[in-house]
Swiss-Prot record:
Subunit structure: Monomer.
Keywords: Blood coagulation cascade activating toxin, Disulfide bond, Glycoprotein, Hemostasis impairing toxin, Hydrolase, Protease, Secreted, Serine protease, Signal, Toxin, Zymogen
Gene3D superfamilies in the record: Trypsin-like serine proteases
Coiled coil: none
Record GO biological process: proteolysis
Protein name: Thrombin-like enzyme acutobin
Pfam families: Trypsin (PF00089)
GO MF terms held by the record: serine-type endopeptidase activity; toxin activity
Peptidase S1 domain residues: 25-251
UniProt function note: Thrombin-like snake venom serine protease that coagulates human fibrinogen by hydrolysis of the alpha chains (FGA).
Length: 260
């Protein structure tokens, strides 16, 4: 598996300048090795192509974006450099996947969240620890941290070997709807960014966490193309609004697949 991953990643590196895909951190810096113990990397299993990020919320469950789903996935937990393996890095496959289908009033983008149950639990270690669900809703103006192995150029064609991190701000709904007029007023999404531009999540950051005031508040969803445009904050699935559903599924209430 490791040899396949190395060969596949070398091919991806050669092709990355010709590829364009889903979402990356613009204007950030390499994350500190110790600040992303919950960050998960999702790969397409057959080709071992890097797809998205995700967030470990306990020893056997990962939260990511629904649009990151593929027929066959492989997840790396405790990874930093794509080409340098930590001793405690762990790989897992999904055993179950769940999608939010609880309301016809929500758009597909509102429902852009997926729960993945790992085929076996992971162990906490130097580079692995889960991130709890939020205990309170986020506040407009909060300083938030977004991270991922996504594109680091607005044109989306440069992918890093290591995750990048950057601070952005939570934007109010009025500013968000000016940028995205078709966004419903009742949308279960968050807007975050820097209104001057130049800093943003980007392609292949999708599915990764938005952490505001120390709490896991968002899942990278989608944004402008090119990334990091002025007055175009990115959109994030609002995790707090899905707390009940997530807890229901992870507690074993999988038949309803909806909050009680």
């Amino acid at each position: 598996m490791v040899l396949i991953r190395v060969l596949a990643n070398l091919l991806i590196l050669q092709l990355s300048y010709a590829q364009k895909s889903s979402e990356l951190v613009i204007g950030g810096v390499e994350c500190d090795i110790n600040e992303h113990r919950f960050l998960v990397a999702l790969y397409e299993l057959t080709s071992m192509t890097f797809l998205c990020g995700g967030t470990l919320i306990n020893q056997e469950w990962v939260v990511t974006a629904a649009h990151c789903d593929r027929l066959q996935l492989y997840l790396y937990i405790g990874m930093h450099d794509k080409y340098v393996k930590f001793d405690d890095e762990q790989g897992r496959e999904p055993i179950e996947k769940y999608f939010y289908n609880c309301s016809n009033n929500l758009t597909t983008r509102d429902k852009d969240i997926m729960l993945i149950r790992l085929d076996r639990p992971v162990d906490n270690s130097t580079h692995i620890a889960p991130l709890s669900l939020p205990s309170r809703p986020p506040s407009v103006g909060s300083v938030c941290r977004v991270m991922g192995w996504g594109a680091i150029s607005p044109s989306r064609d440069v992918l890093p070997d290591v995750p990048h991190c950057v601070n952005i701000n939570l934007v109010n709904n009025a500013e968000c709807r000016r940028a995205y007029p078709r966004l419903p007023a009742t949308s279960r999404t968050l807007c975050a960014g820097v209104m001057q531009g130049g800093i943003d999540s980007c392609n292949r950051d999708s599915g990764g966490p938005l952490i505001c005031d120390g709490q896991f508040q968002g899942v990278v969803n989608w944004g402008g193309n090119p990334c990091a445009q002025p007055n175009m904050p990115a959109l994030y699935t609002k995790v707090y609004d899905y707390n009940d559903w997530i807890r229901s599924i992870t507690a074993g209430n999988t038949t309803a697949a909806c909050p009680p």
